[in-house]
Amino acid sequence: MPGADYSAVKGGGLKLKAGKKNLFKVGKEKKKKNKDDKEKIDPDTVENGGWRKIADEFDMKGGTNVAIEVASGAGSTRTYVAAMDNGKFTIGFPHPEGEGPNPEEIFALVKTPDDSKISLKTGFGRYVGVDSEYQLVAMAEAIGSREQFVLVFQEGKTAFQAVSSPLFLSTVPNKEGHIYVASRTATENEMVNIRTDAIQEGPVDWRSVEDRKNARECETAYVKMYQHSKVDLKNRHIAIDVKDKKGVKKAQADGSAHELLLDRRMKMKSDRYC
């Protein structure tokens, strides 16, 4: 309007009638709240000096430190499997609340992402294994079948099983104080807690670069990979089934993309010469 007095207009930022809070701050507050939730400490971890319990195989990372705690129906016992300087093992003394395992109760975990078998190395530089009398020992300087184990996770409980025999570690020492891997079934005396001081990370996608692509690009990559090197790799030489990409997507998720794509490739070749 001509002649209006614009100097009387109060300056400032845009004010929204929806509420007093700035809408742009809502996301930040939510993000901060989620961050605080992630940083919450598990009381069980605090009681064990920062050593958290491993609940499944996917949390087992090679190169980390682990300890084998004697499990109990009442919860944490803070009692661990301990290596002795004579190569044998015993059950250590209970730790006070808030204290982690001793150095002789800590093992270096050896594991590859694509294998469920694990190996453990003591602070004395020897690998944990089972001798001919089924005694838990650490004598070997290299890993063999006797130095390999699997962890059985079921219904929130964990058992320690040898690969060389279908026997489980018992946490009940003999008269000499040594422990054995000689139990045929996993009962209360065979229950353990595997603990680590490593920071828990999110799930890791171990699939290859090709498997992580979308269905069409994934199949194209594998056709190129398995074609003869002398074949020109222009699009006219690459036979791709443009139908049924749902099967490829499912195989990518299941980890069976290699087999499915090779089967599809063979079928396309056979159809061509029919």
Curated annotation (Swiss-Prot):
It is found in: Nucleus, Cajal body; Nucleus, Nucleolus; Cytoplasm. Residues 27-46 are annotated as: Disordered. Residues 34-43 have a biased composition (Basic and acidic residues). CDD domains: beta-trefoil_FSCN_FRG1. A motif (Bipartite nuclear localization signal) lies at residues 252-268. Its main location: nucleus. GO terms for cellular component: Cajal body; catalytic step 2 spliceosome; nucleolus; striated muscle dense body. One of its GO terms (molecular function) is actin filament binding. A motif (Nuclear localization signal) lies at residues 20-36. Keywords: Actin-binding, Cytoplasm, Myogenesis, Nucleus, Ribosome biogenesis, RNA-binding, rRNA processing. The keyword RNA-binding applies. It comes from the Eukaryota. GO terms for biological process: actin filament bundle assembly; muscle organ development; rRNA processing. Binds to mRNA in a sequence-independent manner. May play a role in regulation of pre-mRNA splicing or in the assembly of rRNA into ribosomal subunits. May be involved in mRNA transport. May be involved in epigenetic regulation of muscle differentiation through regulation of activity of the histone-lysine N-methyltransferase KMT5B. Belongs to the FRG1 family. This is Protein FRG1 homolog.
